Structures are given as structure tokens and as C-alpha cells.
Amino acid sequence: MDSAPPPPRIFSRRRRLNARARMAHLRRDGTAVATVARELAADALDRLGFLNRAFSRVLVIGDVTGSFAAGLAGSDTITRADPCESLGEALDEERPLPGGPYDLIVSLGLLDTVNDLPGALALMRRALAPDGLMLASFLGAGSLPIMRAAMLAGDGDRPAPRVHPQVDVRAAGQLMTRVGFASPVVDGWGFDVGFESLDQLVGDLRAQAIGNVLADPGPPLGKAALARARNAFADKASEDGLVRERFEVVTLSGWNPAPRG
């Protein structure tokens, strides 16, 4: 029987690591933007708070501000890891996770840029102890609609691949069931952030490693195309001069089934 074909390489591992290394460099002076990371960490802590359960051994991936690890109570060991070794213990989400089994694995803002999402979820489940919990959040379908429209306006009748494909709640739910998590829960939520310009938005995204890490990123916008994109973005400004961009988040949680009997 032929083995399954490898997943398509939509994202560049090198570009992804470079983006996170750039974020780590910007974070050294403590002033870098981290809006998305803080929102994801705060929501994850809120969700775990409702469980009324302590987790002894925890792996948290992508906690770039450290706010999740700092806010989690009752754990004996918390390991912070990241694809970029400057942000934690280095790991590759598409390879077996080191150091398990864990009672809790949390992934923040990363699964939207792995090439093999089902494989990454399966590897997390395998790294869990029986009755261990996986919780993951990442930017999903519907994120950055104004920027997407502005980029299309800039490209005109020759659109280029500039924005990542995105996972929606329904597809994520199907993946959780396929991978074998027990009692899977998948939901979407979001928040808005105001920006003065397209340039500010792009700069903030790059500072948070949310820039273009596609394997085929397309050519840069030319001068005229960039002007069209900036104007299209500015046209969405409110009376206060800010454009409120939307960030939609997909959150997944599920348990590693305990053995029967």
C-alpha cells in the first residue's frame, strides 16, 4: 500500500523562524507590541480557571510574553518552548515533542502557520499523559479583513499571494475528531485593534511574527500598488482617524483519552 503523500508546503520554515527571531530581538528592550500574544494568553488562563484543576507538568508553546506561565497556578513544572530558541526551548511542532508526557499542553498563536496541522495536533496528543489536556489558540478565518481587501486593491487585476490561508471553526472541529481527542471543544472569538495607517498595522504584525511566511510570498508591492493599498485602508477609518482591524481567534481543546478498564 502506498504511503500518504506529504502535506503541501504552504509555509516556509525558514521564513517562519526568521520572523520569530526578529520578534525575539524586538522584545529584548521590553517595548515591542504583543497585543495578540497577551489576548491569547489571557483567554487561555480564563478557560483553565473554569476547570478547577491543577496540572502538574505543563508544556506551553509560543508564550512570548511569559504572561501565561506567570499566571498559571498549581503546576510543579512549566516548560516554555518555541520554534525559535530565543523564545524558549527549541522545538518543531511537526516532530515528536520532547520531554513528555505532560498533563497540559498549550499552544499560543502558532498552529496557523504549520504545514501539517493534523500531524501537529496528533503529536501533541501523543505527548500528553492519559487524561491530559491540549489547549491551542491561533488566528483563524475572518482575521484582518480590511488589510486583505487593501492588499487586493493594491494588486488590482493581478493578485499575488500575500496573506495566509486561514482555518475556520468547522474545519478545526473536524480535525480534532479525526486526531482522536476526547470531548473536543472548538470555538471562535475575536477582538478589534485600532490603527492609524496600513504601515502601522503591517509593522505591528511583523513585530509579533504575524507577517508573511508563505513559501511563495509573491513579489513586493510596487510604489503605485502600495499607494492604492494605503488609500484603500485609510478609507475605512472612523471619525477618530483609526481603522479598526479584526482579529478572529480559533481555540481548540481536547483530552487524551485515558485507557479503559
Residue ranges and their predicted role:
Residues 135-198, 211-219:
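Conserved catalytic/acceptor-binding region of the Class I
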Residues 102-118, 122, 138:
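A short SAM/SAH-binding and catalytic strip from SAM-dependent methyltransferases
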Residues 29, 33, 189-261:
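Conserved Class I S-adenosyl-L-methionine
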